[in-house]
């Protein structure tokens, strides 16, 4: 429940100051919202491209699906490369810290050419492509998620300012102003009446 409005000059000044602050802060919020909307659109495109690349890599790897069901070949792929370098950082976009994937390096390990079929290179290359594309796709999705989350938060604040805080404060100022004006008129009337009575007593 909201507190009762104090119909005083101090309250009037406080509400006017509050309205000024809201009016000053709203453009900043709206600018941030616009920036976030642009960044979200960009992140959506990047995420879509990364997901498409990952799906294509997965489809190419599915060509070897039967081979992945054979433990000998599955073990060969698992033992033939590893994630050697994984560099991540944090990037600030419109005030939001999002993960930045700087570099991922998959290192190929030595394996016996005599003990593996000639197509094992294609199988390993397909698996490496899939792993890399999945890492980048997951990073792109996380960036998008964080930006969308902040956009929702800022949008809620903009709506709160525009639909509730500013109109409510303006209405409060108007109500106090009307009350103070009416009271001033009443006070003037009472003063005139008092002066008139004093004058009558003198006569």
Swiss-Prot record:
Native source organism of the sequence: Chlamydia muridarum (strain MoPn / Nigg)
Lineage start: Bacteria, Pseudomonadati, Chlamydiota, Chlamydiia, Chlamydiales
Gene Ontology terms for molecular function: ATP binding; proton-transporting ATP synthase activity, rotational mechanism; proton-transporting ATPase activity, rotational mechanism
Keywords, alphabetical: ATP synthesis, Hydrogen ion transport, Ion transport, Transport
InterPro entries the UniProt entry points to: V_ATPase_D
Superkingdom as given in the UniProt entry: Bacteria
Family: Belongs to the V-ATPase D subunit family.
Coiled-coil positions: none
Function text: Produces ATP from ADP in the presence of a proton gradient across the membrane.
Record GO biological process: proton motive force-driven plasma membrane ATP synthesis
HAMAP family: ATP_synth_D_arch
Protein's name according to its UniProt entry: V-type ATP synthase subunit D
Pfam families: ATP-synt_D
